Amino acid sequence: MKNSFQTLKTLTTKSGTYGYYDLQELERKGVAEVSRLPFSIRVMLESLLRNEDGYQVTREDIEALARWRPDPGEINVPLKLARVILQDFTGVPAVVDLAAMRDAIKAKGGDPKRINPVVPADLVIDHSVQVDAFGTAYAFFYNVEKEYERNRERYLLLKWAQNALENFRVVPPGTGIVHQVNIEYLTKVVMTGKRDGLTLAFPDSLVGTDSHTTMVNGLGVLGWGVGGIEAEAVMLGQPYYMLAPRVVGFKLYGELPEGATATDLVLTVTEMLRKHGVVGKFVEFYGPGVAKLSTPDRATIANMAPEYGATMGFFPVDEETLNYLRQTGRPEELVELVEAYTKAVGLFRTPEAEEKVQYSEYLELDLSAVEPSLAGPKRPQDRVPLKEVKKSFLAHLTKPVKERGFGLSEDQLQRKVLVKRRDEEFELTHGSVVIAAITSCTNTSNPSVMLGAGLLAKKAVEAGLDRKPWVKTSLAPGSKVVTDYLEMSGLMPFLEALGFHLVGYGCTTCIGNSGPLPEDIAKAVEEGNLVVAAVLSGNRNFEGRINPHVKANYLASPMLVVAYALAGRMDIDFTTEPLGFDPNGKPIYLKDIWPSMEEIREAIRKTLDPELFKKEYSKVFEGDERWQALPAPTGELYQWDPESTYIQNPPFFEDLGERKVEDIRGARVLLVLGDSVTTDHISPAGAIPVKSPAGQYLISKGVKPEDFNSYGSRRGNHEVMMRGTFANIRIKNLMLDGIEGGYAKKLPEGDVDFVYNVAMRYKAEGTPLLVIAGKEYGTGSSRDWAAKGTYLLGIRAVLAESFERIHRSNLVGMGVLPLEFLPGENRETLGLTGYEVYDILGLEDLKPRKLVDIVARREDGSEVRFQAIARLDTPVEVDYYKNGGILQTVLLNMLKEAKATE
């Protein structure tokens, strides 16, 4: 490695002597004023200094980033990251790709063992558990049993990977949620590694195959979500290429008032940042209010960066970070190293250091103005103060669908359905809460809101309140430590008394694994076509995500989740209406059972012990007896089973070789879509309908509908996933009138069929395909199958008004061209309907962000000519596109290197 600026120094702690690259030396040498750089940019700069090789990372790269300005312009940053994290929904297809790459390199005469993570990778199995059983003491055991039954093939693949791949660890099922395991155990904040006989210290940094990887930003660790294909490239030693971002400085001051929680704060921050516009930017928090937030509070805010649209929500390392490392049982010598290193290198936050920093844009929030809130019913940025939820929900019932309402007429509002059970009967109506889920790493990582929920449950039970019988209740924490401290505090029995029994350690309801509603409830919802609600402590509430029967979804703190389980309806004003009545008929209001901050702090003091973390994480990679009993396949190549409906060798590397890039001519439009189309819309993760192309494929393979599992669990099989692309029941193809769901029109014939069937007919004719969309295309999860499925359907380009960051780069990574309308232009202004035939010209000599010419020929022979920006943002992305994708580029380079050394 080079050291052009002579910044390599040493520091000594009790645990030894470490080499480190001193950022502050650049300032002393007059290269750049590093002290005015945002802390997040400094972490990136350190990576460049440490990895300068004159080829992938050059002296010029370092100088350009060191001289970052609030309006940074075009600075290409080749980031070398310290590690990669994966979850199993996105991790399984990544492992499938690595296995397929081993096959491909062997077929070309190369060594399969060259395909190995160079960068350490940890995969946490958390996305597969579903809430089949709930509300009973045996729910956890039943759900885990079902999880293993459904996912045996996938888990065998992951065990093969654990054995066959170097630098690859797996956290088995039933252990925790990836981001919570990451902040409580995996991240060290400061890493060490050997180079040239010296032990180097350097900041932890990572990418993850899940958009909420940003949670670790709460500990001052650089990290964000990427698609599986990009994560694989990083694992294989490729730099992660990005443009230096604008950094929004978000000042926090004051203190949270009594009654407000970290959840209320994050929903407020999300609303503010979505309004401000932070897509593609870093957000860095500073100011006196930061010191008033615990690390779990910060991690809650960082977790929801995808919801506010930022690449990161960054809190620099400070005294509170060190406290958290101690609280979670990290070794004292690590804490000492983190403190010594971050102070030596200029990465430790102090009020004096903050004052010098220059940001691109500024926002501020007085924490004392935060009030109890929910977000919904369809988007995480749509915050509603608790006191206005009733009014807001009732208004949404009749609001038009295009204004994110439910479009009910006045006479539909009165619908009620009587449900009769053996020992009771009750009415369901619009606004009945049918799911109340304490779920998601966003909140279950935060002891204050979890113990708060337990205290609220205790007071409710003591007042004689109970959950409503139509509410499906669940508790799914992100780590075993949560149940340990809930049990130690004596609060678990009160949560269980209200039906909040442990259902699993995993994502569950937050990602749509809410399991089926009880049959009588589902039937009543269908019969009355009711707009029923879910209240969850998650981070996403997009339509159609949580449960196919539930149209209104609200994000809330765990305490409010319990409150809505007691109320059983959204049309309640907690400030004026009682939750229920005690045995003497006395009304009980929410304020009567809401725990005080002092009660919560006292519960934390009594129960949160570093030994809990040490105990649970000492065996984090072991798994239960089921995991240990799985017969792990061996060998450097994976043995594909042609009969498997979970794992198949994908066709991505069949035509490996440099391709000639040509103009796209004679393209037809498969779908015209509106704004905020999510990756959930493009590639759903939840249930597979029987009559869908994916369902019919599985039936043809002898799979019974009750064994379909979910789309997310079948991401290792491209045959299922390409059939599931654009198959969300809530997607709206604007080329079709009055039809919702995954349908398209075959042109010029004009007949309507499933998207997959129409795409295959076009493919048979050799017709390239195009998708046209509005703003924020691809928002939501970092789901690489949204790009892989797009590619496999034969879609060559996506033309949108704007793209969410991860999905745009995933499209490039699959060799699909993202095209952006020029500012002020869109489908409507240009009069495009989707019935035209398209030529996309000027692709032979592509360069970053080139303007390409598009000709749209209408049915009457007239033409619309316009230009669009080819969103290949860096020279490297142009190469990826030319080679057919990022993994193809990596393989081609490996084969070239192997030839050169022969």
UniProtKB/Swiss-Prot annotation:
GO BP terms in the entry: lysine biosynthetic process; propionate metabolic process, methylcitrate cycle; tricarboxylic acid cycle
MF-aspect GO terms: 2-methylisocitrate dehydratase activity; 4 iron, 4 sulfur cluster binding; aconitate hydratase activity; metal ion binding; mRNA 3'-UTR binding; mRNA binding
Disulfide bonds, paired cysteine numbers: none
Xref: Pfam families: Aconitase, Aconitase_C
UniProt entry tagged with the keyword Transmembrane: no
UniProt entry keywords in alphabetical sequence: Amino-acid biosynthesis, Iron, Iron-sulfur, Lyase, Lysine biosynthesis, Metal-binding, RNA-binding, Tricarboxylic acid cycle
Binding site for [4Fe-4S] cluster: C441, C507, C510
Enzymatic class: lyase
Keyword rRNA-binding: no
InterPro entries from the UniProt entry: AcnA_IRP_Swivel (IPR044137), Acnase/IPM_dHydase_lsu_aba_1/3 (IPR015931), Acoase/IPM_deHydtase_lsu_aba (IPR001030), Aconitase/3IPM_dehydase_swvl (IPR015928), Aconitase/IRP2 (IPR006249), Aconitase_4Fe-4S_BS (IPR018136), Aconitase_4Fe-4S_dom (IPR036008), AconitaseA/IPMdHydase_ssu_swvl (IPR000573)
Cofactor stoichiometry and binding remark: Binds 1 [4Fe-4S] cluster per subunit.
Pathway, per record: Carbohydrate metabolism; tricarboxylic acid cycle; isocitrate from oxaloacetate: step 2/2; Organic acid metabolism; propanoate degradation
Enzyme nomenclature, EC number: 4.2.1.3, 4.2.1.99
Swiss-Prot/TrEMBL catalytic activity: citrate = D-threo-isocitrate; (2S,3R)-3-hydroxybutane-1,2,3-tricarboxylate = 2-methyl-cis-aconitate + H2O
Subunit structure: Monomer.
UniProt record similarity statement: Belongs to the aconitase/IPM isomerase family.
Protein's name in the database: Aconitate hydratase A
UniProt lineage: Bacteria, Thermotogati, Deinococcota, Deinococci, Thermales
Gene encoding the protein: acoA
